[in-house]
Amino acid sequence: MKKTKIIEQEILINTTPHEIYEAFMDSKIHSKFTESKAKISREIGGKVSAFEGGLSGKNVELIPDKKIVQTWRSEGENWPKGYYSTITLILEPVDKGTMIKFTHVDVPEGAYESVKEGWDTYYWESLKELLE
């Protein structure tokens, strides 16, 4: 694998950790806020698919309402075939809602900008619209 990068973000959303966890783990809610078909298993080792199959992966660690760790890969042209990155969401209740401590490690350097923009546009902005 060529060079990789890390995306680290903290996102405050004015809702409960449970609502954010469900948005990521419930196929119907995930499909609604990303405006594309998603199929999400709730089992460790279970498959994750979003954006009509353009993103796929597996659940590595799930602690309801607290933590989600998944492997992810993209079908995009800047993503090596068969290569997986890892996302981690830690959900912390705070006074004004929930702080998402997010990391996405092993992002291929050539895909970094589009992946980072995708998180901002398709996830954080859309989640805020849906849940706040």
Predicted segment positions?
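A conserved amphipathic terminal alpha-helix motif
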Residues: 2, 106-132
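A short, polar/proline- and glycine-enriched secondary-structure boundary/capping micro-motif
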Residues: 32, 60-62, 79-83, 110-116
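Mid-chain, well-packed structural core segment of small domains
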Residues: 69-90
